[in-house]
Amino acid sequence: DQFDCVELLKPLDYQSRYGHGTNQIVLGPDDMLYVVSGNDVAFPEGVAKDSPYREPHDDHLLPEPRDAVQDVRVGHVLKTDLDGKSWEVIAGGFRNPFDLAFNSAGELFTYDADMEWDVGLPWYRPTRLNHIVSGGEYGWRWGTGKWPEYFADSLPSTLDTGLSSPTGLEFGTRGSFPSPYRDALFMGDWQHGRILQVSMSPQGASYTCEYGVFLEGGALNVCDLTFGPDGALYFITGGRGSQSGLYRISYDGVEGDAAIAAVAANDELVQRDRDAAAARELRHQLEEFHQRSDASGIDLAWPYLNSEDRWLRFAARLAIERQQPAQWRDRALSETRPRASTAALLALARLGRAEDQTALLNALDRLPLESMGSSELLDALRVWELSFIRQGSPSATDRVRALARLDTLYPHSSNYVN
């Protein structure tokens, strides 16, 4: 057999620093192609200007000069139709994610690499599983510039797995393994010669995870894995001069219905799953406004600026940020609920309009900083930081006022706040 034809859908600009190129193409449940690339690949020409993820910035108030000479390429996920006619950037801020996988609810995940040189340093980011959402910013930047997870304009990892070399991803729903493997995510680790098994629990609009070792062995450099049409798990090994091989793991038992029925009948789990499904559906409704200019999105999103769920708050803030500033600026400046105020002012600061700076700083001054928890306080400090980065240096009056306000917080019990 041979291909009838070979057609170039899109040239991708690969400028090698460390071999972090375009790694995988996956067909999504929406019959669209999802392409994941590492941080050596620039956004291709012709991507939609209204993509959910746009124009990554370093956004450090005191950048490291040696990092500043690097461009702002980040690992990212593209989405395109089967003909390759329309392209958009879904999410970014990764180092070198190797693969993508959708769970049974249609939620997307990737397994991102750490930077081994950074081990033991404050900016080290462990190898991590990320839940990919519309417009998601996951904070990888060059050198020392990696964002801490508490930055309000980013999203946290869903699971950290420490030192490893991420490779293939696959959910057990494609195989014939019994419970609990059926709902697990299988992740390849080339460095340690193992396959990890991740169990997920819905939490709000995202998930929490636990993991264990499903399989490991010496000289078992797992490169990729997938479930075959027979329901078995296939994986391939090799690379960098190591032994290459193709392996199959199959289940030869019969899954009983009793255990599945017992879990399904657990009222607490049923209610948890219903609540989580509703939260994810709400997040999807908010995400529709990440690419749509429609003032109705402001009223829909505004209540969720005050949500305790970080994933809902992120989706709501981005939905508002994508609307015309004149439609929500005054509402942001007059918001009185501390968490909602911080999220709204974050959106205003990210727009980088110098004419809004004094009013924004005045609104920040009204926040009850002394009574706010550490996480809310860090969110507020991020707004000050982004104002000075994107809106420009403050006036002498604004500078003195900001120094006086922030000086009252030091020293703080949180090292991150300090």
Role assignments for model-derived ranges:
Residues 134-150, 154, 198-418:
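Extracellular/periplasmic ectodomains of large secreted or surface enzymes and adhesion receptors
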